[in-house]
Structure formats: structure tokens, C-alpha cells
Design a protein with these regions (language model features):
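Soluble acyl-CoA-dependent acyltransferase catalytic core bearing the H(X)4D motif
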Residues: 9-179
Length: 179
């Protein structure tokens, strides 16, 4: 069903660390971590006339602040209030014109806590090389960190003609896909 959201989510609740944790720190953390998962800076592009499967292309307008959002619970910040927020966030479809993920920082969770809600399209988390954005965030491996994001430059988006030629070349290489 085309109206059924095809994403998965996670909810992580943390104690606020000494020194605090805020939106800017979360954006910086995600920027650092997704540098190692290029798919999180790509979006889906349809091949004209449906001549081939959709392809992944770099999002030349990638904006981290679109994907990392902020919310706050009203006092008292109960678990039930958090669950109600999750119930509002998760059913909304992801924007297919952008990379297919969102992260929400939820402040004001009772007992001096905050939550991170993730929403990721299943195409990013299915398969051998798939990595959920939640796993990227809580990865404790220091070798997975680094400044690759600052040097990333998106590749030019293919033209319609290039997509059609690519789809036709794929059809010649794998004729069983045509049937």
C-alpha cells in the first residue's frame, strides 16, 4: 500500500550528562558519525518513465538541520507524554525528496533525562551493509569518528538521459529483470 509508511524507528532515553546535552551537540555528533555512512546524505531518484528501478543520488541540497529536529515535553515530562509524542511523529511519512531519515531530540523528559527518537526508511536499514541512524549515534568505537563530513562534496545529480541510458544498460546486462 503506497500510503503505508515504510520506516522503522527507535527511542533512546538518556540521563542528561554533566555539562548538559543540547541540539547543537546532537547535530555535531550526527554530522561526525554519518560521514562514514554516505547513504544518509543520498535521496531516491526515479528513472523517467519507470524504465528502471529508482537510484540513489547525492542530495546536493543536503541540510543536516532539516533531518535533526527538536521537541520538548511539557511538565512533568512523563513516559506517557513521550509515548504520545512518538505516536504523533512515527506515522508521518518521510519526505521522498530528501534523504530518508529523521532524528528528534526530545528535551524535558522527567528525572533530568532527554530522548532521541529516530525514524529511518527500511531501505536504509535492510541488508548486509545497512546501518540504522540510531546505531550510528551510539557507536562507541572511537575509530568510527572523524572529520570526513567537512570534506564531503555531493556528486552532480545524473540527468534524465543518463538515468534512462543507465536503466537500458542494466536491462541489457540482466535481461531476466525485463520479464
Amino acid at each position: 500500500d503506497a500510503t503505508t509508511p515504510m520506516h522503522v524507528g527507535s527511542v533512546m532515553v538518556f540521563d542528561v550528562p554533566k555539562g548538559g546535552f543540547d541540539y547543537d551537540r546532537l547535530v555535531a555528533l550526527i554530522a561526525e558519525r554519518i560521514a562514514h555512512v554516505p547513504r544518509y546524505r543520498q535521496r531516491i531518484r526515479e528513472v523517467p518513465a519507470g524504465l528502471g528501478n529508482p537510484v540513489w543520488v547525492d542530495d546536493v541540497k543536503f541540510d543536516m538541520t532539516y533531518h535533526v529536529r527538536r521537541s520538548a515535553l511539557p511538565r512533568p515530562g512523563s513516559d506517557q507524554q513521550l509515548e504520545e509524542l512518538i505516536a504523533r511523529i512515527q506515522p508521518r511519512p518521510l519526505d521522498r525528496n530528501r534523504p530518508l531519515w529523521e532524528v528528534y531530540l526530545v528535551e524535558g523528559v522527567a528525572e533530568n533525562r532527554f530522548a532521541i527518537i529516530t525514524k529511518t526508511h527500511h531501505s536504509l536499514v535492510d541488508g548486509i551493509n545497512a546501518v540504522d541512524i540510531g546505531n550510528v549515534l551510539v557507536d562507541g568505537n572511537p575509530t568510527s569518528r572523524g572529520g570526513v563530513m567537512s570534506t564531503w562534496r555531493p556528486r552532480a545529480e545524473p540527468s534524465d538521459a543518463e538515468l534512462v541510458v543507465g536503466a537500458l544498460a542494466d536491462a541489457v546486462r540482466t535481461p531476466s529483470q525485463i520479464i
